[in-house]
Amino acid sequence: MPQLIPPQELYSLLLWFAPCFTQPSFAHFVSFIVCFCSGLGRLTATTVYRTSPRESHWTNYSRFLSCYRWSLQALSARLLALLVKDCGLWRDDQGRRRLCLVLDETLVEKTSKRMYGVAWHRNTHGGLCRGTHLLGHYWVMLGLLVRLAGQPRCCPLAFRLYRQKKRCPAAEYRTPCQLARELLESLLWPSGPDLVRTVLADAGFADSELMRWCVQEGIAVITRGRIDARVHDLYVQQSGRGRPRKWGQPISLAEFAADENNFTQTIALYQDRTPVQLASVVGRHRQSGLVLRFVILRTADQAPVVLMSTDLSLTPREIAQLYADRFQIELTFRELKQHFGLGHYQVRKPLAMLRHVHLAGLACALTQLLSLKGMTRKTSAGRLKATPWRRSGAPSVHETQLWLRWACERRGLFGKWPSPGHLRKRSKAPQRRSQAQNHQWKSAEL
């Protein structure tokens, strides 16, 4: 394998994380991130050792994951500060800055039954062709929703491993919603006078305890609800006799969605390709006891979708747009599994497992930042030929990974970026010897 030397653009980003490590540990950290960003082969500690130009024993890279002293919490905090500094924050209609975090889970297939945390989990993402259950790890991820070159993207921040109740001690068992709360508690949030923290999640994290905790901590929650949810009117009419009533008249969301007059707004979501009709109502959720805004989304030939928001100041259009941007975390899972070695770890210690996954997420986030810088050079210098299927926008994560691999192998900067077609031809073409090497080879045969 070739030795990978990071270019200046990537190394300047890696220097941001130097306070989290000692000098020897930072050198191993650079080797891991450069290897993961390049995406060469199966991304394990052995691959990092083979591609690193440093003279170090191969066991040092395994011990960097299992027993070296460095904090994942500090690494996530530095990454969050870097993303906020370089990408900025989204502003709502009232001019407030919103720090949008995304929660979701994914499955990583593993065949070893002796590996820590491996169990059979219900498959809700891979399709029926792969079976209803998969053997592997169940990861809960927290990501930051940013906009790069006008397009929303999700950058991974932190991970937690879910273990089934029957496979761990009772004191160590945590549900996915409890793991999500631990991720939010461990994150070092930035501060600001007009900063609003917002969490986006799917229906799997619509837990009443998690929502109440977020409201107590001043965190807004936007999640998917049920069409048959028990909702009550805010106005409580008292009869004058007996104990005072706590709940108003019930509101049926199914009947509310069946009335055509309630859908007063139409917007376009998912890159302005899908027209969606919106209807909104404010009520008190019976299960959580919170006052929520319920937004009903209706598209052609689809069942209505119900969204719940604890922030009543957000308009229905903003709630629908933010939840549509939440889908970027699914694309991030695909990039992590296909190009950044999310499931390539071959370790048994839980700490080494968790650190490997965190480094893969960090490499994915830094590659997305480099794709933004690549787009800036593309528009200014015109050195990159645009792909025929994308008229405008930043390069994809995989294209940036190919260019980064070329720069690391050539020890060059991002001044001369090759086209993706040149990279494909270069990977398929056989290596030719120069005239001097050919003459030396013939003389050696004689």
Residue ranges and their predicted role:
Residues 59-63, 125-195, 291-306:
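Electropositive, glycine- and tryptophan-enriched low-complexity nucleic-acid-binding patches
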Residues 1-73, 79:
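Gly/serine-rich nucleotide phosphate-binding loop at the start of the catalytic core
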Residues 107, 254, 316-347:
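Short amphipathic alpha-helical "interface-anchor" segments enriched in bulky aromatics
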Residues 48, 97-111, 142, 197-206, ...:
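Short, conserved catalytic/metal-binding motifs centered on acidic residues
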Residues 1-28, 36-37, 148-161, 173, ...:
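A short, flexible helix-boundary coil/loop motif
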Residues 69-163, 275-281:
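Active-site-proximal, Lys/Arg-enriched surface segment
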Residues 31-38, 303-327:
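Extended, non-catalytic structural segments that build the interaction scaffolds
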Residues 166-241:
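Domain-level cores of phosphate- or acyl-group-handling catalytic modules
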